[in-house]
């Protein structure tokens, strides 16, 4: 069967159907079990990070190397011609597109990744995060981790906690889980950082249950997944940040009464919203979650760059 993701831009999780998501997750599981060190041996991939990143950039570049690809790019957009000389993003991408087989890009401006697709010369663009908008590859590793720990992606009770306004990971994850039946969402956030109305409207239109809460402890006994997020300091003014940064903090004691299968996830970096005593509980799974980024991103790269992928 032809691979539906071959040469496809991956900008939003909505670019992927449920069937596409399931294909990526099957491929990720296969690559985790059976490494393919020469799968992308003759490919060159650009890693273009116009915004700071640790886990996403390193896991993407590790994924590229472990599949045998050559990697070019930069980790700081301020040192490029765009940053130093005022070149437009359109011109930068137009040139990079002539050098490589795929472009992985992070940019602080919402919509930048979608814009890049118009100037890449048909070279596929993979969004590694654009402002507060979308982070589809984080969602793929989140889905992979949920499936790995729960054995399913349907009938999941998931709480999302913290900065639900600017946290692009929760926007993408809510949209992805809405493609699977029976999932229920519990949203816990300061009023100023509540889940955007368009996400709530999407859930309502699909008939998906959600509820708003003011504490973590009140919902813990009902949860399969507790998804913590940090407050996005870089997107708030200092006074706003001071008011909300410590409003929701998870401590080990808060997990009393949790189901045995509960896993605590976090896209990282963690600041102080999960205390270190949680790390020692059987519920903590955020470091393993980060490790799964390798396999989810390998799967996406493999599918986008291979017309007929059979693993």
Swiss-Prot record:
Entry-linked PROSITE patterns: CARBAMOYLTRANSFERASE
Give the EC number(s) under which this enzyme is classified. Answer: 2.1.3.2
Is Cell inner membrane among this UniProt entry's keywords? no
GO cellular component terms listed in the entry, alphabetical order: cytosol
Its UniProt pathway annotation is:
Pyrimidine metabolism; UMP biosynthesis via de novo pathway; (S)-dihydroorotate from bicarbonate: step 2/3
**A single BP term in Gene Ontology:** 'de novo' pyrimidine nucleobase biosynthetic process
Q: What class of enzyme is it?
A: transferase
Q: Which HAMAP family does this UniProt record tie to the protein?
A: Asp_carb_tr
Protein name, as recorded: Aspartate carbamoyltransferase catalytic subunit
